[in-house]
Amino acid sequence: MNTNKDQEERKYPLNQIYFYLTEGCNLRCRHCWIAPKFQEKGCSYPVLAVDLFKSIVEQAKTLGLSGVKLTGGEPLMHPDISKILDYINNQDLNLYIETNGVICTPEIAQQIASCKNPFVSLSLDAADAEKHEWVRGVNGCFESALKGVKNLVNAGVKPQIIMCIMRRNKDEIEGIVRLAESLGAGSVKFNILQPTVRGEQMHKKGETLTIEELVELGAWVENSLSDSTDLRLFYDHPAAFRPMSKMFGDSGNGCSTCGVLGILGVLADGSYALCGIGMSVPDLVFGEASTDLLKDVWETTDVLNELRSGLTDRLEGICGDCLMKNFCLGSCIAQNYYKNKNLWAPFWYCEEAGKVGLFPETRMRPTVG
């Protein structure tokens, strides 16, 4: 006979772990929502031990694990990245990687390609070196990133190019699409700069776009620019702003929402957290992999259980009234908590759009009376 706990485990499997493998990064991106330490030659910062990585994966497989995301910091800087990739391959896990591409060698690219269903997101913030390197903070990183893309494509992996939109590079959007086409990438995603950690400072300095500009750009990307390319384009605004045809049906890309109820983060120091936000928000760190059983963390952490029972009924403000909330789940719980210290707070983008009359009325719950 199945117990209630067995049923609960099936209802909320641990689908994916986000491994933040390194505290250091070889770039110093001005918009980063995590703000890792810049790792120059001659200095080093903590990385996740390989044995601990393996132990976590072994425990997670009994909870439903099907894939892992390697991110950072910069995951390819991990001194044992080759061993980690081999282990993922041997465990038959789906592989997702977020990288700046700068040190993606042909050998590493081939290892990535040998894994199950590899998906690589690689950051390029402009189609020219000057603007990209202004964003990323290191001279020469543009050409190195291009080599990384080419190495992946040559190995048989078509990466997704990710561009973070800000005032300095807003005119580079179409250029990035054309560059991605020429490089043989698989898709392009346009991220909205979040007001978190370094990004928060950029918002305060006026280096980001207004909500009016962001909404207008999203409509242009999805309704016009996307028709000019065979690449799939993703503009990362909440589901309420996306045309139904872009989410559903044969040509739809899905809702592109966070799977917050089925993921867990592991930081470079071995801490369990909601995701990388644990580097900045201690409230969202749940335990230590070296001492706490993953099963206990997954099943008994108050925050995780609150999210399971509260999403989406407890969402507040405009998110609580949105017809897309069961798909969107508040867009980014980590961002909402960082800004408001409240799991149920509305997402800033939707809130700002609502204030200026740009939140789609057709996606709002009808008022009675």
Residue spans for each PLM region:
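Residues that line or immediately flank small-molecule/substrate-binding pockets and catalytic motifs
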Residues: 36, 72, 124, 192, ...
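Conserved alpha-helical substructure of the radical SAM core
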Residues: 1-119
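Radical SAM enzyme [4Fe-4S]-AdoMet core and its adjacent flexible, acidic
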Residues: 114, 123-125, 130-292
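Accessory C-terminal segments flanking Radical SAM cores
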Residues: 238-358
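Short Fe-S-cluster ligation motifs
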Residues: 55-72, 307, 345-369
